[in-house]
């Protein structure tokens, strides 16, 4: 479905929606790419925002009021309809002791803008971007890999603009990328990319992305590959080796809180980031800030699981061709290898790497 939020009078709305419906039935793919629009309410006219939903099955049009969240959200699809941008104010509870956003805050914002992008093109709100076919077959998206590079952390009160888009990733998954900017200066302050795979919600087994599902979301993806990071020799593609015992640093017996479960009933992927950081040595936390984090998600973690976080220092890895960290690693940077595992049987939950740089002088 395609959602159009516009401020129009009833008569103008009827004429516009008839045109939209006819155009969509004639050529739905090109219609979506040409005609996605978003109009915000204006105080001058006092008109109420309306939402038009064009059905891909019948070409029918349903009119309804935009939600309050739609009206307040500072985000919209870009002009071509193939990516989504949203602005966020960094709040007091999203910063650490140095008054800058934490990496968990950044990861939560990435997740939020991704979900809002999915909603803006008509995907389900009862899960993470599920399509009609996915809901019929009880399928959900789960994170397979997350890679985040932060060049400059936003401070309390700063406004961050995040752009996101998704695209196909082979036959078994999809990819979502993000670019973060300072809303005032336009400076790129971070980039991220992720890989998602499909899971059956009942059996908890991975499943290939069917052509039906692919057809439902590809119309909202760039036709040509668009990547936040260049593909050649970049850190986001590097294979992560498994950390073997004995680890240099560890935090044993971590337990998920009820609040750590997401709407798909497993531990939210941002929680794993916090667990990984729990075993970073305090002297690094005091003098460095996280620059790059890459995580591979190996298995689900349930509410009753008990988790061990293991960390070991690793040798330097080469720069990231085209990314802001390329060629900037120096003797003041520190890199670590991480492993999250079940305390009981040692099953691997997550493996990762982090790169830390010296904190800027205040």
UniProtKB/Swiss-Prot annotation:
Keyword Chloroplast: yes
Claim: Plastid is one of the keywords in the record: yes
Any one GO CC term of the record: chloroplast
Localization per record: Plastid, Chloroplast
EC code(s) of this entry: 3.1.2.14
UniProt keyword list: Chloroplast, Fatty acid biosynthesis, Fatty acid metabolism, Hydrolase, Lipid biosynthesis, Lipid metabolism, Plastid, Transit peptide
GO process terms (BP): fatty acid biosynthetic process
Presequence boundaries: 1-38
CDD domains in the record: 4HBT
Chain spans, region Disordered: 312-331
Molecular function per GO: fatty acyl-[ACP] hydrolase activity
Stored SUPFAM superfamilies: Thioesterase/thiol ester dehydrase-isomerase
Function summary: Plays an essential role in chain termination during de novo fatty acid synthesis. Possesses high thioesterase activity for oleoyl-ACP versus other acyl-ACPs. Substrate preference is 18:1 > 18:0 > 16:1.
Protein family according to the UniProt entry: Belongs to the acyl-ACP thioesterase family.
Protein name stated in the entry: Oleoyl-acyl carrier protein thioesterase 1, chloroplastic
Organism: Arabidopsis thaliana
Organism lineage: Eukaryota, Viridiplantae, Streptophyta, Embryophyta, Tracheophyta
Gene giving rise to this polypeptide: FATA
